[in-house]
Amino acid sequence: MTISLKDVEHVAMLARLKLSDEEKEMYTKQLNDILKYAEQLQELDTENVKPTAHVLPIKNVFREDKVHQHLDPEKALANAPEREENFFKVPKII
């Protein structure tokens, strides 16, 4: 698989990026270099390699939940431009 100049131009258009001709050429070359490296990785023999999610043996470390003093609702809402009961009122965005 290779990346063409047209592919780079299409992605730049989707991302709303204005790229110079030199940048388009540079990104095309860099992306193709990355793909060539990924193809080299595909050639590795992984037949006897055990599948892992992480190279180090890691387990989740959880902490105990502790109750802490919290901010009083009146203080939290003191500088709110608008509020409704004990909630911040914000403009509808959808």
Curated annotation (Swiss-Prot):
It comes from the Bacteria. It holds the Pfam family GatC. One of its GO terms (molecular function) is asparaginyl-tRNA synthase (glutamine-hydrolyzing) activity. Keywords: ATP-binding, Ligase, Nucleotide-binding, Protein biosynthesis. SUPFAM superfamilies: Glu-tRNAGln amidotransferase C subunit (SSF141000). It catalyses: L-glutamyl-tRNA(Gln) + L-glutamine + ATP + H2O = L-glutaminyl-tRNA(Gln) + L-glutamate + ADP + phosphate + H(+); L-aspartyl-tRNA(Asn) + L-glutamine + ATP + H2O = L-asparaginyl-tRNA(Asn) + L-glutamate + ADP + phosphate + 2 H(+). It is an enzyme of class 6 (ligase). Its EC number is 6.3.5.-. GO terms for biological process: glutaminyl-tRNAGln biosynthesis via transamidation; regulation of translational fidelity; translation. Allows the formation of correctly charged Asn-tRNA(Asn) or Gln-tRNA(Gln) through the transamidation of misacylated Asp-tRNA(Asn) or Glu-tRNA(Gln) in organisms which lack either or both of asparaginyl-tRNA or glutaminyl-tRNA synthetases. The reaction takes place in the presence of glutamine and ATP through an activated phospho-Asp-tRNA(Asn) or phospho-Glu-tRNA(Gln). Belongs to the GatC family. HAMAP family: GatC. Heterotrimer of A, B and C subunits. This is Aspartyl/glutamyl-tRNA(Asn/Gln) amidotransferase subunit C. It comes from Carboxydothermus hydrogenoformans (strain ATCC BAA-161 / DSM 6008 / Z-2901). The lineage of its organism: Bacteria, Bacillati, Bacillota, Clostridia, Thermoanaerobacterales.
